[in-house]
Amino acid sequence: MDFISIQQLVSGERVEGKVLGFGHGVPDPGAWPSDWRRGPQEAVAREKLKLEEEKKKKLERFNSTRFNLDNLADLENLVQRRKKRLRHRVPPRKPEPLVKPQSQAQVEPVGLEMFLKAAAENQEYLIDKYLTDGGDPNAHDKLHRTALHWACLKGHSQLVNKLLVAGATVDARDLLDRTPVFWACRGGHLVILKQLLNQGARVNARDKIGSTPLHVAVRTRHPDCLEHLIECGAHLNAQDKEGDTALHEAVRHGSYKAMKLLLLYGAELGVRNAASVTPVQLARDWQRGIREALQAHVAHPRTRC
């Protein structure tokens, strides 16, 4: 039984007398259609021809729609056409609704209570209304807290500046003799503290218990305010009515940063308070108290492991 080789099929050589074993004659490969022999080559050629025709059509379309910019009218026509195309592509942007400021809605006079509340909440339009109507910037409540006190506590620096320009007293005292500097240190607002001190506020003011802003900055754990007070001339070893210095307070509250700053700037370790205790002894007593509490806890039968 004879078979046609691959080479014969590809080359198209004539084969004579090739008959299958089943009695069916096999036609001469040389007589087969030429499309069958050259099928892959012609398919590639047809694909290339098709791509060339598509490129040619695209080029013709481009040339037919191209503008010849021979004069200014042609250029204007091109610009108008581009604008028209852009309008179709990008929808027009909706205008944003106008929001009327609340200041215009407030027409009634602003009372003292509303004025102080506005200072705490930073509602400047109410402050402006109050001051425009001739209100006193130093007006206060029953505890002698002014708008400047509240603005300093809450950290509204622009409002602080506005009140100072309007004539607010920079060293106004509340019922505990605390000035706005105390309130700024209590809130930890360094920017406002700088504003007040630049306006001549007293850095070593004292309240009714003899504390200074330095004591307050230590108690409220605001080392940035503490350092600025020291740089502006705060007394490092100032004592309150209990005889405690800022270093005593730093030890008592366990504020490592405050202790480090005070010692770095030269705070004295040997100052005794009213109980004749120095900051060093206070630290030892504090450590001893912790140690005794831990030992008592461990010695308790219910807490043994």
UniProtKB/Swiss-Prot annotation:
Coiled-coil positions: 41-72
ANK repeats: 143-172, 176-205, 209-238, 242-271
One Pfam short name: Ank
Annotated disulfide bonds: none
InterPro entries: Ankyrin-SOCS_Box, Ankyrin_rpt, Ankyrin_rpt-contain_sf
Major localisation: nucleus
TM segment ranges: none
Compositionally biased residues, Basic residues: 83-92
PROSITE patterns attached to this UniProt entry: ANK_REP_REGION, ANK_REPEAT
GO CC field: actin cytoskeleton; cytosol; I band; intercalated disc; nucleoplasm; nucleus
Tissue: Mainly expressed in heart, skeletal muscle and brown adipose tissues.
Its job: May be involved in the energy metabolism. Could be a molecular link between myofibrillar stretch-induced signaling pathways and muscle gene expression.
Subunit structure: Interacts with titin/TTN and MYPN.
Name used for this protein in its record: Ankyrin repeat domain-containing protein 23
Species, as recorded: Homo sapiens (Human)
